[in-house]
Regions:
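Intrinsically disordered, low-complexity polar regions and short flexible loop motifs
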Residues: 1-205
Length: 205
């Protein structure tokens, strides 16, 4: 596919529905419908926004009586962001995740990171093929991007407290790709959602 350019004075933003108890949602930015009928574990496409201040309101699909989540965003130029709807119904919020527009895809290696978005799962250690990547990753935290040889990997989350395995996810990681693996859902029914991040496709000239 053609590369994507972040134009001067703008940024790119997408929304990820990661709230396991929440219904399908419509996303309004500054009172304008931007994404509709976004289901749990679904991503929107990236949209271009000018730098500035924005209000984000998330409604149950087809309604506009009361947003289930509202938040504000002060957007600088040159960013690439994922806005995740997270939490349980009694404590929903928006989490801004920086997709790091400076990170470049490589023809020699793959890159990935892990984000913990399960609201009822304590801090976890992340193992890659049984080797520790990071310890005590808490809800709403993410690892840094890690470069790794392309191939198939078992990515496992174990509770930091007692080393109980709570998720094993099989990931296929390719060259020229930058991925995020999101831990979503509620224990004991966790899921791994693998995303190719938009920084994979940014123009580099």
């Amino acid at each position: 596919m053609d590369c994507v350019k972040i134009e001067s004075g703008t940024s790119l933003l997408r929304v990820f529905h990661a709230a396991p108890q929440a219904p399908a949602v419509d996303v309004y930015i500054n009172e304008k419908l931007v994404f509709s009928n976004l289901q749990f574990t679904q991503f929107s496409s990236y949209v271009k926004l000018k730098e500035g201040e924005y209000r984000i309101d998330i409604f149950q699909t087809g309604t506009m009586l009361q947003p289930i989540i509202s938040g504000s965003l002060d957007l600088d130029e040159g960013q690439m962001l994922t806005i995740a709807a997270i939490g349980n119904l009694d404590d929903l919020s928006l989490l801004v995740i920086n997709d790091n527009a400076d990170k470049k895809a490589s023809p020699k290696v793959s890159s990935f990171r892990v984000v913990h978005l399960s609201p009822n799962t304590p801090a976890v250690d992340i193992l890659v093929n049984n080797k520790i990547l990071v310890e005590s990753l808490a809800f709403k935290q993410n690892t840094s991007y890690v470069d790794i040889a392309p191939g198939s990997y078992n990515i496992e989350a174990v509770l930091n407290s007692n080393k109980e395995s709570v998720l094993v996810f099989g990931a296929v990681l390719k060259t020229n790709r930058i991925y995020t693996i999101y831990i979503v859902g509620e224990s004991p029914n966790l899921r791994g959602i693998q995303s190719v991040d938009g920084n994979t496709y940014l123009c580099r000239y």
